[in-house]
Amino acid sequence: MRVLVVDESAERAEVLRDGLRRAGYEVSASLSSPLALLKTIDELQPDVIVIDTDSPSRDVLEHLVVMSERGPRPVVMFASDGAPEVIREAVRAGVSAYVVDGLDAARVKAIIDVAVARFEDFQRLRSELAEANLKLAERKLVERAKGILMKTRGLGEESAYALLRKSAMDRKLRIAEVARQLVDAANLLGA
């Protein structure tokens, strides 16, 4: 597993890199400033990002938000600042594990394992939510299309659905796509 290390302190970064290597991780790069974070992530495509900081700066959190939108990955943050609002901001920015009060090289592997597991669970939940929202939107679209057919053709609900389904099968499209086309056409015609 490739790890990108971000730490403004060269001494702490060396301790962290050493702990990661001993735990079996490949340290792909080490940054002393978060300014090149996005560029480095794009170039190296690390599996995990480990950030060691006294308190996460606004710049670091903004970079993490952008990274999460582009290509989310687990982020572990070791910080001295344990203020609840700082932790909440870090988690909202995409931090998978926020560890307060110092870096212990012996615990790094366990912390990264937990962060990766939490990240994977969160990604699975996010995917399931997106799928559920899509199905709900498609169901609403089919209901609108049925309503249009019922109104314009004088059909019952079952007949309207059967007509949508037949049209979808004849055109080798999903029923939601046929419904979308019908709703779009009705909107265009003002029906």
Residue ranges and their predicted role:
Residues 1-12, 16-20, 49:
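Conserved acidic segment of CheY-like receiver
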Residues 49, 73-82:
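A short, hydrophobic beta-strand element within the central beta-sheet of small alpha/beta folds
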Residues 130-191:
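C-terminal output/effector regions of signal-responsive regulators
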Residues 24-33:
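Short hydrophobic/Thr-rich beta-strand motif most characteristic of the beta2 strand and flanking loop
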Residues 85, 103-112:
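C-terminal output helix
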Residues 13, 33-38, 47-67, 83:
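Conserved phosphotransfer microenvironments
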